Amino acid sequence: MTEELTKTTENKPIVIQAAPLVPAPDEIGVLSRTERAGFWLTHRMNLGIAKRLMTFGQRHIGSLWIYLATYNLMNVFGIENVETTDVDTPLVLVANHRSFFDMYTVSSVLFRRTMRPMELYFPVRGKFFYDNPLGWFVNLVMGWFSMFPPFFREAREARKREFDKFSMRRLVQLCSEGRGHIIGFHPEGKRNFSDDPYSILPAQPGIGKVIYSAHPQVIPVFIAGLGNDLPKQILGNWTGGPKIRIWFGEPIELQEFYEKGDRLRTHKELSDHLMAKIAELGEKDREKFG
Protein backbone atom coordinates (compact mmCIF):
# COMPACT_ATOMS: atom_id res chain seq x y z
CA MET A 1 0.00 0.00 0.00
CA THR A 2 3.00 2.28 0.13
CA GLU A 3 5.65 3.26 -2.37
CA GLU A 4 9.22 4.41 -1.83
CA LEU A 5 9.42 7.74 -3.67
CA THR A 6 12.85 9.12 -2.78
CA LYS A 7 15.78 8.61 -0.41
CA THR A 8 17.20 10.51 2.52
CA THR A 9 20.81 11.61 2.81
CA GLU A 10 21.41 8.46 4.85
CA ASN A 11 20.23 6.39 1.89
CA LYS A 12 17.12 5.27 3.76
CA PRO A 13 13.85 5.22 1.83
CA ILE A 14 11.19 7.78 2.55
CA VAL A 15 7.88 5.93 2.55
CA ILE A 16 4.83 7.94 1.57
CA GLN A 17 1.56 6.62 2.94
CA ALA A 18 -1.37 6.07 0.65
CA ALA A 19 -4.19 8.58 0.98
CA PRO A 20 -6.78 7.57 3.60
CA LEU A 21 -9.60 5.61 2.06
CA VAL A 22 -13.15 6.98 1.86
CA PRO A 23 -16.39 5.02 1.39
CA ALA A 24 -17.96 4.65 -2.04
CA PRO A 25 -21.35 6.36 -2.57
CA ASP A 26 -23.24 3.05 -2.40
CA GLU A 27 -21.49 2.23 0.90
CA ILE A 28 -22.07 5.54 2.69
CA GLY A 29 -25.55 5.72 1.18
CA VAL A 30 -26.92 2.89 3.35
CA LEU A 31 -26.36 4.93 6.52
CA SER A 32 -28.88 7.32 8.03
CA ARG A 33 -28.25 11.06 7.92
CA THR A 34 -27.14 11.02 11.57
CA GLU A 35 -24.81 8.09 10.99
CA ARG A 36 -23.27 9.77 7.96
CA ALA A 37 -22.70 12.95 9.96
CA GLY A 38 -21.15 10.95 12.80
CA PHE A 39 -18.91 9.09 10.39
CA TRP A 40 -17.61 12.15 8.52
CA LEU A 41 -16.96 13.99 11.80
CA THR A 42 -14.98 11.10 13.25
CA HIS A 43 -13.24 10.38 9.95
CA ARG A 44 -11.92 13.94 9.82
CA MET A 45 -10.86 13.88 13.46
CA ASN A 46 -8.62 10.93 12.59
CA LEU A 47 -6.67 12.75 9.87
CA GLY A 48 -3.64 15.05 9.89
CA ILE A 49 -3.49 17.90 12.37
CA ALA A 50 -6.84 16.95 13.91
CA LYS A 51 -5.56 13.46 14.76
CA ARG A 52 -2.41 14.92 16.28
CA LEU A 53 -4.52 17.25 18.43
CA MET A 54 -6.74 14.35 19.50
CA THR A 55 -3.64 12.32 20.40
CA PHE A 56 -2.32 15.24 22.44
CA GLY A 57 -5.61 15.30 24.33
CA GLN A 58 -5.47 11.56 24.93
CA ARG A 59 -1.91 11.75 26.22
CA HIS A 60 -2.26 14.75 28.52
CA ILE A 61 -5.95 14.83 29.51
CA GLY A 62 -7.66 11.51 28.81
CA SER A 63 -4.89 9.37 30.25
CA LEU A 64 -4.73 11.59 33.34
CA TRP A 65 -8.32 11.11 34.45
CA ILE A 66 -8.05 7.36 33.89
CA TYR A 67 -4.85 7.34 35.95
CA LEU A 68 -6.48 9.31 38.77
CA ALA A 69 -9.37 6.82 38.83
CA THR A 70 -7.18 3.70 38.92
CA TYR A 71 -3.68 4.43 40.24
CA ASN A 72 -4.16 2.68 43.61
CA LEU A 73 -5.38 -0.47 41.90
CA MET A 74 -3.20 -0.68 38.79
CA ASN A 75 -0.73 -3.50 38.18
CA VAL A 76 1.02 -3.64 34.79
CA PHE A 77 3.23 -6.42 33.48
CA GLY A 78 5.25 -6.73 30.28
CA ILE A 79 5.02 -3.11 29.14
CA GLU A 80 8.57 -3.46 27.82
CA ASN A 81 7.16 -5.68 25.08
CA VAL A 82 5.38 -2.63 23.68
CA GLU A 83 8.40 -0.35 24.14
CA THR A 84 10.60 -2.56 21.96
CA THR A 85 8.26 -2.79 18.96
CA ASP A 86 9.05 -1.05 15.67
CA VAL A 87 7.26 2.33 15.62
CA ASP A 88 7.29 2.39 11.82
CA THR A 89 5.15 -0.76 11.60
CA PRO A 90 1.57 -0.70 12.95
CA LEU A 91 1.03 -2.56 16.20
CA VAL A 92 -2.18 -4.47 16.91
CA LEU A 93 -3.10 -5.16 20.54
CA VAL A 94 -5.51 -8.08 20.93
CA ALA A 95 -7.20 -8.27 24.32
CA ASN A 96 -9.93 -10.12 26.17
CA HIS A 97 -13.07 -8.06 26.72
CA ARG A 98 -14.90 -7.87 30.04
CA SER A 99 -15.39 -4.14 30.63
CA PHE A 100 -16.48 -1.15 28.57
CA PHE A 101 -13.33 0.54 29.90
CA ASP A 102 -10.79 -2.11 28.81
CA MET A 103 -9.11 -0.27 25.95
CA TYR A 104 -9.42 3.17 27.56
CA THR A 105 -7.43 1.87 30.51
CA VAL A 106 -4.88 0.20 28.24
CA SER A 107 -4.46 3.46 26.32
CA SER A 108 -3.77 5.36 29.56
CA VAL A 109 -1.09 2.84 30.49
CA LEU A 110 0.52 3.19 27.06
CA PHE A 111 0.62 6.97 27.22
CA ARG A 112 1.83 7.18 30.81
CA ARG A 113 4.33 4.30 30.88
CA THR A 114 5.95 4.43 27.46
CA MET A 115 7.58 7.11 25.34
CA ARG A 116 6.55 5.39 22.13
CA PRO A 117 5.05 7.61 19.40
CA MET A 118 1.48 6.49 18.88
CA GLU A 119 -1.83 7.15 17.21
CA LEU A 120 -4.63 4.99 18.59
CA TYR A 121 -7.58 3.45 16.77
CA PHE A 122 -10.28 1.25 18.27
CA PRO A 123 -12.80 -0.31 15.85
CA VAL A 124 -16.27 -0.07 17.37
CA ARG A 125 -19.89 -0.99 16.75
CA GLY A 126 -21.65 1.83 14.96
CA LYS A 127 -24.72 1.48 17.18
CA PHE A 128 -24.90 4.44 19.61
CA PHE A 129 -21.41 5.80 18.87
CA TYR A 130 -22.37 6.85 15.34
CA ASP A 131 -26.18 6.96 15.24
CA ASN A 132 -26.63 9.25 18.24
CA PRO A 133 -25.03 12.67 18.92
CA LEU A 134 -24.61 11.56 22.53
CA GLY A 135 -22.49 8.70 21.21
CA TRP A 136 -20.35 11.19 19.31
CA PHE A 137 -19.85 13.06 22.59
CA VAL A 138 -18.88 9.87 24.43
CA ASN A 139 -16.40 9.07 21.65
CA LEU A 140 -14.86 12.51 22.15
CA VAL A 141 -14.79 12.50 25.95
CA MET A 142 -13.72 8.88 26.39
CA GLY A 143 -11.67 8.20 23.29
CA TRP A 144 -10.84 11.54 21.68
CA PHE A 145 -12.57 10.17 18.56
CA SER A 146 -10.30 7.11 18.48
CA MET A 147 -13.31 4.75 18.31
CA PHE A 148 -12.90 4.34 14.57
CA PRO A 149 -13.73 2.87 12.10
CA PRO A 150 -17.32 1.82 12.86
CA PHE A 151 -18.94 -1.50 12.00
CA PHE A 152 -22.71 -1.92 11.74
CA ARG A 153 -23.48 -5.42 12.99
CA GLU A 154 -27.09 -5.10 14.14
CA ALA A 155 -29.16 -8.01 12.81
CA ARG A 156 -32.15 -5.75 12.09
CA GLU A 157 -30.03 -3.46 9.91
CA ALA A 158 -28.26 -5.98 7.68
CA ARG A 159 -28.25 -3.61 4.71
CA LYS A 160 -25.80 -1.36 6.58
CA ARG A 161 -23.18 -4.08 6.34
CA GLU A 162 -22.51 -2.70 2.89
CA PHE A 163 -20.74 0.11 4.73
CA ASP A 164 -18.65 -2.45 6.64
CA LYS A 165 -16.84 -3.25 3.39
CA PHE A 166 -15.32 0.23 3.59
CA SER A 167 -14.56 -0.11 7.31
CA MET A 168 -12.72 -3.35 6.67
CA ARG A 169 -10.61 -1.76 3.91
CA ARG A 170 -9.83 1.24 6.11
CA LEU A 171 -8.94 -1.01 9.02
CA VAL A 172 -6.56 -3.06 6.89
CA GLN A 173 -4.98 0.19 5.71
CA LEU A 174 -4.49 1.41 9.30
CA CYS A 175 -2.95 -1.94 10.25
CA SER A 176 -0.69 -1.99 7.19
CA GLU A 177 0.97 1.42 7.32
CA GLY A 178 1.40 4.43 9.53
CA ARG A 179 4.11 5.46 11.96
CA GLY A 180 2.99 4.93 15.54
CA HIS A 181 -0.32 3.30 14.64
CA ILE A 182 -1.68 1.18 17.48
CA ILE A 183 -4.98 -0.58 16.86
CA GLY A 184 -6.87 -2.23 19.71
CA PHE A 185 -9.03 -5.28 19.04
CA HIS A 186 -11.19 -7.64 21.07
CA PRO A 187 -11.14 -10.93 19.10
CA GLU A 188 -14.19 -12.16 21.04
CA GLY A 189 -16.26 -9.45 19.38
CA LYS A 190 -18.31 -8.67 22.48
CA ARG A 191 -18.00 -8.39 26.23
CA ASN A 192 -17.80 -11.54 28.32
CA PHE A 193 -20.10 -11.23 31.35
CA SER A 194 -19.11 -14.54 32.95
CA ASP A 195 -18.26 -14.48 36.65
CA ASP A 196 -15.02 -16.33 35.84
CA PRO A 197 -12.41 -13.65 34.96
CA TYR A 198 -10.34 -16.26 33.12
CA SER A 199 -13.06 -17.52 30.81
CA ILE A 200 -12.91 -16.47 27.18
CA LEU A 201 -15.47 -16.41 24.39
CA PRO A 202 -14.85 -17.93 20.95
CA ALA A 203 -12.73 -15.76 18.69
CA GLN A 204 -14.37 -14.21 15.64
CA PRO A 205 -12.63 -14.60 12.27
CA GLY A 206 -12.73 -10.89 11.41
CA ILE A 207 -9.56 -10.01 13.31
CA GLY A 208 -7.82 -12.94 11.65
CA LYS A 209 -8.77 -11.59 8.24
CA VAL A 210 -7.47 -8.11 9.06
CA ILE A 211 -4.15 -9.38 10.39
CA TYR A 212 -3.75 -11.85 7.53
CA SER A 213 -4.20 -9.01 5.05
CA ALA A 214 -2.09 -6.38 6.84
CA HIS A 215 0.78 -8.31 8.52
CA PRO A 216 1.15 -5.91 11.48
CA GLN A 217 3.03 -6.52 14.69
CA VAL A 218 0.69 -8.23 17.18
CA ILE A 219 0.87 -8.30 20.98
CA PRO A 220 -1.63 -10.13 23.22
CA VAL A 221 -3.08 -8.34 26.24
CA PHE A 222 -4.92 -9.82 29.22
CA ILE A 223 -7.04 -7.51 31.38
CA ALA A 224 -8.62 -8.34 34.74
CA GLY A 225 -10.21 -6.40 37.58
CA LEU A 226 -12.10 -3.74 35.64
CA GLY A 227 -15.86 -3.41 36.06
CA ASN A 228 -18.61 -1.77 34.02
CA ASP A 229 -19.95 0.54 36.76
CA LEU A 230 -17.99 3.79 36.39
CA PRO A 231 -18.84 5.40 39.77
CA LYS A 232 -18.11 2.12 41.57
CA GLN A 233 -14.86 1.73 39.66
CA ILE A 234 -13.69 5.22 40.57
CA LEU A 235 -14.76 4.88 44.21
CA GLY A 236 -12.96 1.55 44.44
CA ASN A 237 -9.67 3.31 43.78
CA TRP A 238 -9.90 4.75 47.30
CA THR A 239 -11.96 2.09 49.07
CA GLY A 240 -10.00 -1.00 48.16
CA GLY A 241 -11.65 -2.23 44.98
CA PRO A 242 -10.38 -5.22 42.99
CA LYS A 243 -6.82 -4.93 41.72
CA ILE A 244 -6.60 -4.07 38.02
CA ARG A 245 -4.10 -6.21 36.16
CA ILE A 246 -2.91 -5.61 32.62
CA TRP A 247 -0.51 -8.10 31.04
CA PHE A 248 1.28 -7.35 27.76
CA GLY A 249 2.71 -10.45 26.12
CA GLU A 250 5.57 -10.83 23.68
CA PRO A 251 4.95 -10.20 19.95
CA ILE A 252 3.20 -13.16 18.33
CA GLU A 253 4.86 -14.94 15.42
CA LEU A 254 2.25 -15.56 12.72
CA GLN A 255 4.25 -16.60 9.66
CA GLU A 256 2.75 -20.10 9.68
CA PHE A 257 -0.68 -18.58 9.06
CA TYR A 258 0.53 -16.21 6.34
CA GLU A 259 1.77 -19.23 4.41
CA LYS A 260 -1.75 -20.70 4.30
CA GLY A 261 -4.49 -19.79 1.85
CA ASP A 262 -6.50 -16.59 2.26
CA ARG A 263 -9.77 -18.18 3.35
CA LEU A 264 -12.19 -18.19 6.27
CA ARG A 265 -10.64 -21.27 7.87
CA THR A 266 -7.23 -19.61 7.99
CA HIS A 267 -8.71 -16.43 9.45
CA LYS A 268 -10.50 -18.41 12.19
CA GLU A 269 -7.38 -20.44 13.02
CA LEU A 270 -5.37 -17.23 13.30
CA SER A 271 -8.01 -15.65 15.56
CA ASP A 272 -8.10 -18.77 17.75
CA HIS A 273 -4.32 -18.62 18.05
CA LEU A 274 -4.54 -15.03 19.27
CA MET A 275 -7.10 -15.98 21.93
CA ALA A 276 -4.87 -18.85 23.04
CA LYS A 277 -2.03 -16.37 23.60
CA ILE A 278 -4.35 -14.11 25.59
CA ALA A 279 -5.44 -17.12 27.66
CA GLU A 280 -1.78 -17.92 28.41
CA LEU A 281 -1.42 -14.48 29.96
CA GLY A 282 -4.60 -15.16 31.91
CA GLU A 283 -2.96 -18.24 33.40
CA LYS A 284 -0.02 -16.11 34.52
CA ASP A 285 -2.48 -13.80 36.22
CA ARG A 286 -4.26 -16.75 37.84
CA GLU A 287 -0.95 -18.01 39.25
CA LYS A 288 -0.12 -14.61 40.72
CA PHE A 289 -3.53 -13.32 41.81
CA GLY A 290 -6.00 -16.19 41.52
Residue ranges and their predicted role:
Residues 65-97:
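Helix-to-loop junction immediately C-terminal to a conserved catalytic motif
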Residues 86-160:
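Catalytic core of membrane glycerolipid acyltransferases/transacylases, capturing the structured
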Residues 2-37, 41-42, 161-290:
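Non-catalytic C-terminal accessory region of glycerolipid acyltransferases
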Residues 72, 116-118, 242-244:
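Residue-level signal for beta-strand positions within conserved beta-sheet cores that form or flank
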Residues 61-62, 76-81, 110, 168-170, ...:
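A generic local structural motif
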